[in-house]
UniProtKB/Swiss-Prot annotation:
It comes from the Viruses. Transmembrane segments: none annotated. It holds the Pfam family Poxv_Bcl-2-like. This is Protein OPG005. InterPro entries: Poxvirus_B14/B22/C16, Poxvirus_Bcl-2-like, Poxvirus_sf. It comes from Vaccinia virus (strain Copenhagen). The lineage of its organism: Viruses, Varidnaviria, Bamfordvirae, Nucleocytoviricota, Pokkesviricetes.
Length: 181
């Protein structure tokens, strides 16, 4: 189940927009202060030490996809963890080629998952390289080009949740902890 909500409040005469998303019970909240046009989720400047559980990795990936899909994201201000996740785009190009992101039927989650599984050797035990490529593909597809904003990021989040299993999150957590970034 997905729910989106936006809470607007006025503490100390400064307007803040706090969009939040809940996917299958996992909630993410973001802050964006006006007139500052910057979108910062809580894991944006996280380090590998701030991810301790599978739930932390799920939460981080949810926030990350929302962050890269937001048109006011300042990617140059990303923390080291997000820069690592952004770097996975090259893994996606190596595994899937350069044209898959535009060819996937993002509005049909099941078909997307099946197409991506065709590139994976063992779906129940994906390698770190395959996981990086999947996240990189989602990153490439979620990044807003120009000023166009759409809801494709929700489909990307759903596909990511459907294709990744518990073992994948553990493999990804281990990779993040051992990566040099």
């Amino acid at each position: 189940m997905i729910s989106l909500s936006f809470l607007i409040h006025n503490p100390l005469k400064k307007w803040k927009l706090k969009p939040s998303i809940s996917i299958n019970g996992y909630r993410s909240t973001f802050t964006m202060a006006f007139p500052c046009a910057q979108f910062r989720p809580c894991h944006c400047h996280a380090t590998k030490d701030s991810l301790n559980t599978v739930a932390d990795v799920r939460h981080c990936l949810t926030e990350y996809i929302l962050w890269v899909s937001h048109r006011w994201t300042h990617r140059e201000s990303a923390g080291s963890l997000y820069r690592l996740l952004i770097s996975f785009r090259t893994d996606a190009t190596e595994l899937f080629g350069g044209e898959l992101k535009d060819s996937l039927p993002w509005d049909n989650i099941d078909n997307c998952v099946e197409i991506i599984k065709c590139f994976i050797r063992n779906d129940s035990m994906k390698t770190a390289e395959e996981l990086r490529a999947i996240i990189g593909l989602c990153t490439q597809s979620a990044i807003v080009s120009g000023r166009v904003f759409n809801d494709k990021y929700i489909d990307i989040l759903l596909m990511l949740r459907k294709i990744l299993n518990e073992n994948d999150y553990l493999t990804l957590l281990d990779h993040i902890r051992t990566a040099k970034y």
